[in-house]
Regions:
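Short, mixed-charge low-complexity intrinsically disordered segments
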Residues: 32-84
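Generic structural motif
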Residues: 10-12, 23, 42-47
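Short aromatic-glycine-(Arg/Gly/Cys) micro-motifs in beta-strand/loop hairpins
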Residues: 1-16, 25, 35
Length: 84
């Protein structure tokens, strides 16, 4: 499975400020620019909700955990995250 690394700065923006194919490139860019924020590893070509289920990190227990609102807002502590 392929992954990308997404950086979201510590400011008030809701959107990421950079996307990288390699963690080393992300860390270098963050260091060079003295940034603070979170770098998270995301799988490519699979919804996060489905990824968590396929990897046994999450099992929906009822319809509320399977509806559109749950899927579009899904997040997991199992995503690899680095703080800067």
């Amino acid at each position: 499975m392929d992954y990308i690394w997404i950086f979201k700065g510590s400011g008030k923006t809701e959107f990421p400020s950079a996307v990288f194919s390699k963690k080393s490139n992300a860390i270098k860019w963050i260091a060079e620019n003295e940034l603070t924020g979170v770098l998270t590893k995301y799988p490519i070509d699979i919804p996060l909700f489905e990824w968590a289920i396929e990897n046994d990190y999450f099992t929906p227990k009822n319809e509320l955990q399977r509806n559109a609102k749950a899927i579009e807002n899904f997040n997991s502590a199992y995503f690899r995250t680095l703080s800067f």
